[in-house]
């Protein structure tokens, strides 16, 4: 099952309910909302989309698994395309 984790070169600046990511290889910034920041914080080690979706549902009571899975897939794909996360096979 593919897993994803942070690119170790990316810097993260936490703010009140958000975070700003900086990818030094591309000089690109990315602003994360509270939900995306929660997921980013889970990526300190490799995790699967299903594991991230489960954690999201546990953290936010009103989130349903199907919606969480879609949202996680979308966020991970965007972060991967911008070089903020890396994938690995387990």
Can you describe what each PLM-predicted range is?
Residues 1-27:
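Long, low-complexity, charged/polar intrinsically disordered regions in eukaryotic proteins
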Residues 25-90:
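Long, charge-rich, low-complexity alpha-helical segments
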